[in-house]
């Protein structure tokens, strides 16, 4: 059960972000620490292999802390583990293990704007509160995940960190978690894009993925797990759905900063990656 989750989670979450590794290669990397090029594949991108291995470590690290309240340091630590040893870690402008210092967009969401770097610390207080207050309720789960992804606190790796975080928080409240599948990426991206107007797209996608993972759990560990799974919601959202720190239009000051160099005042929040990683 554990190995299956590790392989499926690492394969799907990385593949959604452009990894070229197959599920078989992901499995080989997990079980043997090595892999071979697939038929017709001339080369393996080093970062793909490193980030897959790092996802295994991040999942273990997360499980060791599953009952701890989420905070900035925990989230930044997961990012640091995911990006450790990659080419991106070598560029200080990328702020690996820290919140972003420059504006970025969500490419998969038709270049939609995200929260500006200067506003990320405040926005993350809202994100963290939504996860700490998470209930086994379809809207609550989808809202917390959407809030993280629209904040997009890191230069890269936001989807993977957000999905790890959601898995952790569902385990913390003893609710059925999920592994979002790459084959459903289109539905998932549409759900994130439309959530503010039509939350049902994302809610239904996440419920379907929880159904799939529940089937895996019941097949591989029947009668050995205890969890909640509430799949009903009334389709009526009483409050406005918004990320209060998200600006849908940027000006030059937003993009380039007061000094014209994109710098963001203040030290970045960095994660503590001590312990098993």
Which residues are covered by each model-predicted region?
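FIC/Doc superfamily catalytic core
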Residues: 1-156, 160-277
């Amino acid at each position: 059960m554990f190995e299956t989750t590790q392989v499926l989670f690492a394969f799907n979450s990385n593949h959604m972000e452009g990894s070229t590794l197959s599920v078989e290669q992901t499995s080989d990397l997990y079980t043997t620490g090595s892999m071979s090029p697939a038929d017709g594949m001339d080369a393996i991108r080093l970062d793909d292999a490193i980030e897959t291995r790092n996802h295994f470590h991040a999942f273990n690290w997360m499980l060791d802390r599953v009952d701890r309240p989420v905070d900035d340091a925990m989230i930044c630590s997961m990012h640091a583990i995911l990006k450790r040893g990659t080419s991106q870690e070598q560029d200080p402008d990328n702020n690996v293990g820290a919140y972003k210092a420059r504006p970025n967009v969500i490419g998969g969401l038709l270049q939609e704007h995200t929260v500006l770097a200067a506003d990320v610390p405040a926005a993350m207080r809202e994100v963290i509160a939504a996860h700490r207050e998470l209930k086994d309720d379809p809207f609550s789960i989808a809202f917390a995940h959407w809030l993280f992804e629209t904040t997009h606190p890191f230069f890269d790796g936001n989807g993977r960190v957000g999905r790890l975080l959601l898995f952790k928080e569902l385990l913390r409240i003893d609710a059925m978690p999920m592994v979002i599948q790459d084959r459903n990426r289109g539905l998932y991206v549409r759900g994130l894009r439309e959530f503010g107007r039509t939350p049902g797209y994302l809610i239904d996608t996440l419920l379907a993925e929880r159904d799939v993972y529940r089937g895996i759990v019941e097949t591989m560990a029947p009668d050995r797990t205890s969890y909640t799974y509430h799949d009903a919601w009334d389709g009526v959202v009483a409050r406005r759905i918004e990320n209060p720190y998200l600006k849908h239009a940027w000006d030059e000051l937003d993009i380039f900063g007061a000094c014209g160099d994109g710098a963001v005042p203040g030290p970045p929040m960095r994660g503590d990656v001590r312990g098993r990683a």
